From Swiss-Prot:
This is Melibiose permease. Coiled coil: none annotated. InterPro entries: LacY/RafB_perm_fam, LacY/RafB_perm_fam_CS, MFS_dom, MFS_trans_sf. The chain crosses the membrane at residues 14-34, 51-71, 81-101, 108-128, 150-170, 172-192, 228-248, 268-288, 298-318, 326-346, 354-374, 386-406. One of its GO terms (cellular component) is plasma membrane. Pfam families: LacY_symp (PF01306). It comes from Enterobacter cloacae subsp. cloacae (strain ATCC 13047 / DSM 30054 / NBRC 13535 / NCTC 10005 / WDCM 00083 / NCDC 279-56). Its main location: membrane. One of its GO terms (molecular function) is lactose binding. It is a multi-pass membrane protein. The keyword Cell membrane applies. It comes from the Bacteria. Residues 1-13, 72-80, 129-149, 193-227, 289-297, 347-353, 407-425 are cytoplasmic.
Length: 425
């Protein structure tokens, strides 16, 4: 008996939460791509102060991420957390225009702290909570999470081009567009009726779904060289790249005759990149299964180094747009490669913990310091000289990671050797 024939086409939860992804990432795209431009051109912050704002966002993210993770697990399929995030997103425009902006102009630290708390909660930490919730719904409602997640790429891409046009007319329109989209988010939550899977309910009652994880096993992770080498890659490559990308929009628009023209071009380039991102995201598992997770991470590192170093030598708008498009290759290879690496090298029962601590937490923690450092360097020596330093560092860590990251074959060989040693005793 086939129970999954009409899994997606006739599954209301697939379409409801696919649209939820679309709208949520649409709203997120009213913030992040244009935030550095808004901070510099509208608020008048220098690059050092912009770096402080991004550092506060990272600090808030690492504070909220584990808390929201625990709350999300306890709530299960209850929509309480999604309602809180959606209501806060409805206040997106009022907060930015009437709280965040005045505070930034009055006191950079108060403004950065308030913006960091808000953006860190609804976006940096909230996105993980939403993704975890919808992934749970997908398992209970029998649809593929990855296919629903692709709606998010389309939402981000659509908003990037629309927002780029509106930003040139009146930046406040972009924020009000985000608040309006939040109303549709709340409407989706009203009609969404995720139901627990009956089999899962029985298994939970029997205790069969309880993870066999202890605090000792978690702490033992940090005694493993493999864990620290993975964290080295995450901080030295992925984190540095994120810091580079934070203020890239400000650098990008300097290649155009007017800031408005540059903002519009950045929006269109982001849209094209997100469409390519969605296509490559769909194909990336097929590629990664053939080349292996370690090689995928190394390729991602080379792509990131190429974009950063290339940006330091860019002299025309065409060159900087082409370099921007490399982001569409990097994102799928890094995200899918990281998950494949974690599940292939470490105990799969600890995969969520490793991803939270070794990837998200490590990256956000390092970004607190690197964002402020990069912002200061932009002011002191300029974008391109700083990019050359960052790019060479990323390239160096990628080369080192070729020798320090583990492959599945190396893990299997080590396990086999350990088994033979045990038998010989």
């Amino acid at each position: 008996m086939n129970t999954t024939t009409c899994t997606h086409k006739d599954n209301p939860n697939f379409w409801i939460f696919g649209l939820f992804f679309f709208l949520y990432f649409f709203i997120m795209a009213t913030c992040f791509p244009f935030l550095p431009i808004w901070l510099s051109d509208i608020i008048g912050l220098n690059k050092t102060h912009t770096g402080i704002v991004f550092s506060c966002i990272s600090l808030s993210a690492i504070a909220f991420q584990p808390v929201l993770g625990v709350i999300s697990d306890k709530l299960g399929l209850k929509k309480h957390l999604l309602w809180i995030i959606s209501v806060l997103l409805f206040l997106f425009a009022p907060f930015f225009l009437y709280v965040f902006a005045p505070l930034l102009k009055t006191n950079i630290w108060l403004g950065a702290l308030s913006g960091g708390l808000y953006i860190g909660f609804v976006f940096s930490a909230g996105s993980g909570a939403i993704e975890a919730y919808i992934e749970r719904v997908s398992r209970n409602s029998a649809f593929e999470y990855g296919k629903a997640r692709m709606f998010g790429c389309l939402g981000w891409g659509l908003c990037a081009s629309t927002g780029g046009i509106l930003f040139g007319i009146d930046p406040s329109y972009v924020f009000w567009m985000g608040s309006a989209a939040a109303l549709l988010l709340m409407l989706l939550l009203v009609v969404a009726k995720p139901k627990p899977n009956q089999t899962a309910q029985v298994m939970n009652a029997l205790g069969a779904n309880q993870p066999q994880i202890t605090a000792k096993k978690v702490f033992n992770l940090f005694r493993q060289r493999r864990m620290w080498m993975f964290i080295l890659y995450v901080i030295g490559v992925a984190c540095v790249y994120d810091v580079f990308d934070q203020q890239f929009a400000t650098f990008f628009k300097t290649f155009f005759a007017t800031p408005q023209e540059g903002t519009r071009a950045f929006g269109f380039a982001t849209t094209a990149g997100e469409i390519c991102n969605a296509i490559i995201m769909f194909c990336s598992p097929w590629i990664i299964n053939r080349i292996g997770a370690k090689n995928t991470l190394l390729i991602a590192g080379l792509i990131m180094a190429t974009r950063i170093i290339g940006s330091s030598f860019a002299t025309t708008a065409v060159e900087v747009i082409a370099l921007k498009m490399l982001h569409a290759l990097e994102v799928p290879f890094l995200l899918v490669g990281a998950f494949k690496y974690i599940t292939g090298v470490f105990d799969t029962r600890l995969s969520a913990t490793i991803y939270l601590i070794g990837f998200q937490f490590a990256k956000q923690s390092a970004a607190i310091f690197l964002s402020a450092f990069a912002g200061n360097m932009y002011d002191r020596i300029g974008f391109q000289e700083t990019y050359l330093m960052l790019g060479c560092f990323v390239l160096a860590i990628t080369v080192v990671s070729a020798f320090t990251l583990s492959s599945r074959q190396e893990i299997a060989a080590a396990a086999g050797a350990a088994a033979l040693t045990s038998q010989s005793r």
